[in-house]
């Protein structure tokens, strides 16, 4: 299966009629494996900060999670595995696998729980596949 198929079939799929706004699979070094059209242009230091939070959980809480210049308030996640952020009616979920970061960005009417389910399900699958 191609990386494009992972994004199209697993991240941008419909959940109860709702879809992620943007999705990406990127290497932990910040290299883009694949991203949806119009995924926010992120900066290398934003990915570095996200990786630092996986290694030192809670490090993003004081400053927020930035992705593509957008600031998200960090909310409950799973230390070392999942970071979740909220901004207004939308938010972001970042799932860490052995080699990659799975990122899903959503807006209403999608719910945080739906975003978490889509992103984390693909992340768990990729972990099982050795990624």
From Swiss-Prot:
What is a single cellular component term in the Gene Ontology annotation?
cytoskeleton
The subcellular localization recorded is:
Cytoplasm, Cytoskeleton
> Main subcellular localization, coarse class?
cytoplasm
Instruction: Supply the InterPro entries for this chain.
Output: PFN (IPR048278), PFN_euk (IPR005455), PFN_sf (IPR036140), Profilin_CS (IPR027310)
Q: Name one Pfam family in it.
A: Profilin
Top-level lineage group: Eukaryota
* Listed SMART domains: PROF
Task: Tell me which UniProt keywords the record has, alphabetically.
Answer: Actin-binding, Allergen, Cytoplasm, Cytoskeleton
State the Gene Ontology terms under molecular function.
actin monomer binding
State the oligomer form and interacting partners: Occurs in many kinds of cells as a complex with monomeric actin in a 1:1 ratio.
Similarity remark: Belongs to the profilin family.
Q: What role does it play?
A: Binds to actin and affects the structure of the cytoskeleton. At high concentrations, profilin prevents the polymerization of actin, whereas it enhances it at low concentrations. By binding to PIP2, it inhibits the formation of IP3 and DG.
Protein name as annotated: Profilin-2
Give the source species: Glycine max
Q: Species lineage, top-down?
A: Eukaryota, Viridiplantae, Streptophyta, Embryophyta, Tracheophyta
């Amino acid at each position: 299966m191609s990386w494009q198929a992972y994004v199209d079939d697993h991240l941008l799929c419909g959940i109860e009629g709702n879809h992620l706004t943007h999705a990406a699979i990127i290497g932990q070094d910040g290299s883009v494996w694949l991203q949806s059209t119009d995924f926010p242009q992120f900066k290398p230091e934003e990915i570095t900060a996200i990786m630092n939070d996986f290694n030192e959980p809670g490090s993003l809480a004081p400053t927020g999670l930035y992705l593509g210049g957008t600031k998200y308030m960090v909310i409950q996640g799973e230390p070392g595995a999942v970071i979740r952020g909220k901004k207004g009616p939308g938010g972001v979920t970042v799932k860490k696998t052995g080699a990659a970061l799975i990122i899903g960005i959503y807006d209403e009417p999608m719910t945080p729980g739906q975003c978490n389910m889509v992103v984390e399900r693909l992340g768990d699958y990729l972990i099982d596949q050795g990624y």
